[in-house]
Curated annotation (Swiss-Prot):
This is Probable indole-3-acetic acid-amido synthetase GH3.4. It comes from the Eukaryota. Pfam families: GH3 (PF03321), GH3_C (PF23572), GH3_M (PF23571). GO terms for biological process: response to auxin; response to light stimulus. Its EC number is 6.3.2.-. Keywords: Ligase. Belongs to the IAA-amido conjugating enzyme family. Expressed in flowers.
Length: 629
């Protein structure tokens, strides 16, 4: 009676069976490629070289991409490169040169990196098929997660996704962040129904570029679906906490809208209003009362569990600079696990965490050998990034040859045309999945301060401070010493803090508060475009703060360092410090504090490195006033 048995299977059961089979296939894929990691890496390198055989870059190196022995020639001849090394080629592509410069396939767009060069976002060329490769890595996440958290197909995910502004290069190619590219692609917008990826946020709300309207719309939809939400998250921990702070500020109006069944007039985007209107579906006083009862309580500890009671975990990146947000997430989460799932960048998507429910301190990413060709530059953990001698490609280590416990800088060769490109991430080998290593993220090279997607190095900070202190000169005041830290504990969003020790002439005119505020703004104006976008457009960083400390503070800081074993002959004041005893020492000697009075200017719509060519894209200057999140 096989026909009768088949007829008795419901469509839902059949779909569930098919989904289980698909998950099993994905997990088998992970097993297969990690077991044969060395073989897969050799295949990937051969494919990349053959696909890009006509690329001018490889021809300049003398690497015959489509000839026998191309891989050996590549290993022998291809140098290590940074973005500055390939910038002339990138600018040629941006300005409209369509010849095969870096890639044998047409460049489809530029992905703007959070890293900067000359104060501007780096432009990473990519090709159309790379989107499919990135989508393939996304497809591995739920099969891995479902092994540890069953039943995720029975509810919804409140994931808060946002797009950022984009523009076109003089040659007509889109330039945008990698996540904006994905959310605007058919892989996201035309995704087939999958019970494991049912989101509370309508696509229209995700695609809205107005930060306030997008956040408001996504949160009200998440609140309406609160009973069905099984997981919450955002890409970065900083973004998720910004959403919780938004809820803390706007819950009365959100509850009012739910109670009335009508969306607040502050959301004006027609597409967003239409999409949210389909979610609201009329007045719901009982739901509004339930949410209000939780939000009105004096303590917001555990608010995520209380507002979304069925939530099983918080899905956010908490490695690297995002680790500073773990205590705040734990406060609001009330014990919910923090799941850190994937490792990716604008250059390439790399791998995933095969144990996503582990403790944040135990997160290790398995690099998937099919994503790109991986190599590793050994790092001397005791060496200074700036003082270390320039490395050579002959010291590179293959994926399958790294050693447990050792630290390496990640180097990638991609299908899109990056060859032995230094990503700048320092990783530590934490274990192995079959033959593929698992890496713990250690740090980003040369980054002193980071709140969100910003990455500010010491040289850039020093140049900005040097320019800002000129405002003090008319009063005879000068800067004796300074340091900085990223304060993510006292404000959401976090902000940069500078500790300044000053010298003023006896009997001189006191420096007015307005001048210190000008100093704050001048520092911000001197930082890179990513920082300024986060401040002016995304509102993901708060106003920069200067804390003026008492005379002799940095002498006491040196005394503290010497008491902890530092050498007096080698000691120099740190330009960046971490929260802890040093910040407590500095805070104990603060005499005055000042904040930037407004946002720095930020222009959307171009990159000065190619705007100066005369074929500028449309530019828009953004200030804080229009995006009061």
């Amino acid at each position: 009676m096989p026909e009768a048995v088949a007829a008795a299977v419901s469509p839902a059961a059949a779909a569930a069976t098919a989904m289980c089979a698909e998950h099993r296939e994905k997990l088998e894929h992970i097993e297969r490629v990690t077991r044969n990691a060395g073989q897969e890496q050799r295949r990937v390198l051969e494919e990349i070289l053959a696909q890009n055989a006509q690329a001018e870059y490889l021809r300049r190196l003398g690497v015959p991409g489509d000839a026998p022995g191309a891989d050996e020639a590549f290993r022998r001849l291809a140098p290590l490169v940074t973005y500055e090394d390939i910038l002339p080629d990138v600018l040629r592509i941006a300005n409209g040169d369509t010849s095969p410069i870096l890639s044998g396939k047409p460049v489809s767009e530029f992905l703007t990196s959070s890293g900067t060069s000359g104060g501007e976002r780096k432009l990473m060329p990519t090709i159309e098929e790379e989107m499919e490769r990135r989508s393939g890595l996304y497809s591995l996440l739920m099969p891995v997660m479902s092994r540890q958290v069953p039943g995720l197909d029975k509810g919804k995910a409140m994931y808060l996704y946002f797009v950022k502004s984009e523009w076109r290069t003089p040659g007509g190619l889109p330039a945008r962040p990698v996540l904006t590219s994905f959310y605007r692609s058919r892989y996201f917008l035309e995704r087939p129904h999958d019970p494991y990826t049912v989101y509370t946020s309508p696509d229209e709300a995700v695609l809205c570029e107005d930060a306030y309207q997008s956040m408001y719309a996504q949160l009200i939809c998440g609140l309406v679906h609160r009973a069905d939400v099984l997981r919450v998250g955002a890409v970065f921990a900083s973004g998720f906490l910004r959403a919780i702070r938004f809820l803390e500020k706007h819950w009365p109006s959100l509850c009012r809208d739910i109670r009335a069944g009508e969306l607040d007039g502050g959301v004006t985007d027609p597409a967003v209003r239409g999409a949210v209107g389909r979610v609201l579906r009329g007045a719901d006083p009982a739901l509004a009362d339930a949410i209000e009862a939780e939000c009105a309580r004096p303590s917001w500890q555990g608010i995520i569990r209380r507002v979304w009671p069925s939530t099983k975990y918080i899905d956010v990146i908490v490695t690297g600079a995002m680790a500073q947000y773990i205590p705040t997430l734990e406060f609001y989460g009330g014990g919910l696990p923090l799941a850190c799932t994937m490792y990716a960048s604008s250059e390439c998507y790399f791998g995933l965490n095969l144990n996503p429910m582990c403790k944040p301190s135990e997160v290790a990413y398995t690099l998937i050998p099919t994503m790109c060709y991986f190599e590793f530059l050994p790092v001397n953990s005791g060496a200074n990034d700036v003082a270390a001698p320039e490395p050579d490609h002959r010291g590179l280590v293959d994926l399958v040859d790294v050693k447990l416990g050792h630290e390496y800088e990640l180097v990638v060769t991609t299908y899109s045309g990056l060859y032995r490109y230094r990503v700048g991430d320092v990783l530590r080998v934490a274990g192995f999945k079959n033959a593929a290593p698992m890496f713990a993220f250690v740090r980003r090279k040369n980054v002193a301060l980071s709140i969100d997607s910003d990455k500010t190095d010491e040289a850039e900070l020093h140049a900005a401070v040097t320019e800002a202190v000129q405002h003090l000169a008319p009063f005879g005041a000068s800067l004796v010493e300074y340091t900085s830290y990223a304060d993510t504990a006292t404000t959401i969003p976090g902000h940069y803090v500078l500790f300044w020790e000053l010298r003023s002439p006896a009997g001189g005119t006191p420096v007015p508060a307005s001048v210190f505020e000008d100093c704050c703004l001048a520092v911000e104006e001197g930082l890179n475009s990513v920082y300024r976008q986060c401040r002016a457009a995304d509102r993901s960083i708060g106003p920069l703060e200067i804390r003026v400390v008492a005379d002799g503070t940095f002498d006491k800081l040196m005394d503290y360092a010497l008491s902890r074993g530092a050498s007096i002959n080698q000691y120099k004041a740190p330009r960046c410090v971490r929260p802890g005893p040093v910040v407590e020492l500095l805070d104990g000697r603060v005499q005055a504090t000042y904040f930037s009075p407004k946002c720095p200017k930020w222009c959307a719509g171009g990159n000065k490195q190619w705007i100066s060519s005369g074929a500028a894209a449309k530019k828009t200057t953004t200030t804080c006033d229009s995006l009061a999140v």
